[in-house]
C-alpha cells in the first residue's frame, strides 16, 4: 500500500526575490494557504504481512523529505518518521484492539489550516489502543523524544556532557464517550520525564517532568465537524506544548493553558468553510512565556463542480510577551483559485494559484546573540523578530 503527502510550488515576493512566508514572532504556527515556502513530502509504504480470521499484522513505514525549492537538484537527508508493526485482535480478551511497536505517528490531533499539532506524542514507542470498554475505547502508549545535551557526569575527575538526553512520555486516552447526538468526548493524560544515563544528572532547577491534560469534544454538524479542546500542561510539557517532554530545560518551569475551537462545515450549496479560534497562555517562572491569540476562517466557493473552487483565507495572530508586556500582531489574507480532485474542502490533490498579503506590527523579539546570558529571552524592539524591517508585504505564486 502506498500513501503519502506532498506540497511544492513556486512563488515570488512583491518587493522582489523568492516567496517569503509570514509568521508572527512568538506564535507556534502560521496560516498556511499561500504561505508555505518549501517542498515537503512524506512517502508511506505499508503492507499487511499476515492475516488469519480477524487477526492480522501490518507493517507501516514513512520517510519524509524537505528542501527549500530554490533549484532543480536539492539534496537532503531524509527523516525516518515511521517504522512500526500493528497487530489487530491479537489479545482474545480485548477484541478490536491493536498492539503496536516502533516509530509511529500516534493519534495526532491538529488544526489543518494553521498546520498546528496540539496533541502529538509521535516517536519510537509501543502501546495497545482501542480497547473496547463498552462506554468508550481506552488506549495506552509509551513514546520517546530526546534533547541535545541536557545532562552531565563527572567521570575520572572530568566533566562529560551527554550528546543527548532522552525523555519518556506515558500516554493514556479514553475516547468515544458519547455525550449527545453526534457528539463525543476524548480525555487524555500524558506524563513526560527526562531519563538520564547512569551517573549522569540534570542541571539544577531543570524541570525534570510534567503533565499534559487534554479534553476534546467532537460534534458532527452542518455536513462536517466542530472540535472544542481544553489543555493544561506543566513544566517539562510546556516547551513544545504538544505532548513531547523537555525535562532537561531550566527555562520551562511553569504552566500552560490552551483553548481551541476549530472545524470544517458546509455553509450552503457550493459553500464550505474551515475555521479556528485559539487562546494559549504559557506562564513560566523565568517570566519568558507568552499569551497567543489566533482567529481565522477559510471559506471555499465551488465554481465548477467538482474540480474548480475559489478560496479566501483570513487569519490574525497576536502574541504578548510575558517579559516585556509588548504585543506582536499580524493579519494575513490569501485569495486562491484552485482545481482539486473532488468537491470537498478536503479534496486532494489540489493545484492552485494564489496571492497573499500580510501586515504586521512587531514590538518584541528574542535575543539571538550567541553566548549572551540573555540568549533566548524576550526583548523590546524588532531585533530577533520575523518583521524583516517592513510592516507589510505581498506574495504570489502557484502550488499543490
UniProtKB/Swiss-Prot annotation:
Sorted alphabetically, which InterPro entries does this protein's record hold? G_neg_Bact_CarbUptk_Porin, Porin_LamB, Porin_LamB_sf
Q: Where are the transmembrane segments?
A: 1-9, 39-52, 55-67, 79-89, 97-104, 123-133, 136-147, 165-178, 183-195, 208-221, 224-236, 253-267, 270-285, 289-303, 307-322, 326-341, 349-363, 389-399
**Does the record's keyword annotation contain Disulfide bond?**
yes
Which residues are listed under the site Greasy slide, important in sugar transport?
Answer: 5, 40, 73, 225, 346
**Protein task:** Involved in the transport of maltose and maltodextrins.
Q: Topology with regard to the membrane?
A: Multi-pass membrane protein
**Superkingdom of origin organism:** Bacteria
User: Per its record, how is this protein called by name?
Assistant: Maltoporin
- Specify the species: Yersinia enterocolitica
Q: Gene3D superfamilies, per this entry? A: Porin, LamB type
Describe, as the record does, how this protein assembles with itself and its partners. Homotrimer formed of three 18-stranded antiparallel beta-barrels, containing three independent channels.
Q: Which residues lie on this side of the membrane: Periplasmic?
A: 53-54, 90-96, 134-135, 179-182, 222-223, 268-269, 304-306, 342-348, 400
Q: Give residue spans on the Extracellular membrane side.
A: 10-38, 68-78, 105-122, 148-164, 196-207, 237-252, 286-288, 323-325, 364-388
- Annotated S-S bridges: 21-37
Q: What's the catalysed reaction?
A: beta-maltose(in) = beta-maltose(out)
Which family does this protein fall into?
Belongs to the porin LamB (TC 1.B.3) family.
Amino acid at each position: 500500500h502506498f500513501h503519502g503527502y506532498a506540497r511544492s510550488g513556486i512563488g515570488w515576493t512583491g518587493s522582489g526575490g523568492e516567496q517569503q512566508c509570514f509568521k508572527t514572532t512568538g506564535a507556534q504556527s502560521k496560516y498556511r494557504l499561500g504561505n508555505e515556502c518549501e517542498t515537503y513530502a512524506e512517502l508511506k509504504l505499508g503492507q499487511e504481512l499476515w492475516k488469519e480470521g480477524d487477526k492480522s499484522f501490518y507493517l507501516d513505514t514513512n520517510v519524509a523529505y524537505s528542501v527549500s525549492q530554490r533549484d532543480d537538484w536539492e539534496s537532503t537527508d531524509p527523516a525516518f518518521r515511521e517504522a512500526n508493526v500493528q497487530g489487530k485482535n491479537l489479545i482474545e480478551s480485548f477484541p478490536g484492539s491493536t498492539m503496536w511497536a516502533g516509530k509511529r505517528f500516534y493519534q495526532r490531533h491538529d488544526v489543518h489550516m494553521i498546520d498546528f499539532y496540539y496533541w502529538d506524542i509521535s516517536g519510537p514507542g509501543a502501546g495497545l489502543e482501542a480497547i473496547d470498554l463498552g462506554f468508550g475505547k481506552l488506549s495506552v502508549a509509551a513514546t520517546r523524544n530526546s534533547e541535545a545535551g541536557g545532562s552531565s557526569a563527572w567521570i575520572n575527575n572530568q566533566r562529560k556532557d551527554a550528546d543527548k538526553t532522552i525523555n519518556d512520555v506515558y500516554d493514556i486516552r479514553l475516547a468515544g464517550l458519547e455525550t449527545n447526538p453526534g457528539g463525543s468526548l476524548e480525555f487524555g493524560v500524558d506524563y513526560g520525564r527526562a531519563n538520564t544515563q547512569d551517573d549522569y544528572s540534570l542541571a539544577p532547577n531543570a524541570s525534570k517532568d510534567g503533565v499534559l491534560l487534554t479534553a476534546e469534544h467532537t460534534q458532527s454538524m452542518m455536513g462536517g465537524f466542530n472540535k472544542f479542546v481544553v489543555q493544561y500542561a506543566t513544566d517539562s510539557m510546556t516547551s513544545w506544548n504538544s505532548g513531547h517532554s523537555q525535562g532537561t530545560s531550566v527555562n520551562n518551569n511553569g504552566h500552560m493553558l490552551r483553548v481551541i475551537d476549530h472545524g470544517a462545515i458546509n455553509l450552503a450549496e457550493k459553500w464550505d468553510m474551515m475555521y479556528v479560534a485559539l487562546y494559549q497562555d504559557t506562564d513560566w517562572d523565568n517570566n519568558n512565556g507568552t499569551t497567543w491569540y489566533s482567529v481565522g476562517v477559510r471559506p471555499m466557493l465551488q465554481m465548477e463542480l467538482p474540480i474548480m473552487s475559489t478560496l479566501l483565507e483570513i487569519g490574525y495572530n497576536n502574541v504578548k510577551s510575558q517579559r516585556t508586556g509588548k504585543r506582536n500582531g499580524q493579519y494575513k489574507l490569501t485569495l486562491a483559485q484552485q482545481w482539486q480532485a473532488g468537491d470537498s474542502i478536503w479534496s486532494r490533490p489540489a493545484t492552485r494559484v494564489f496571492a497573499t498579503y500580510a501586515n504586521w506590527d512587531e514590538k518584541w523579539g528574542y535575543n539571538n546573540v550567541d553566548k549572551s546570558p540573555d540568549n533566548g529571552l524576550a526583548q523590546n524592539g524588532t531585533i530577533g523578530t520575523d518583521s524583516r524591517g517592513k510592516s507589510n508585504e505581498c506574495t504570489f505564486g502557484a502550488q499543490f
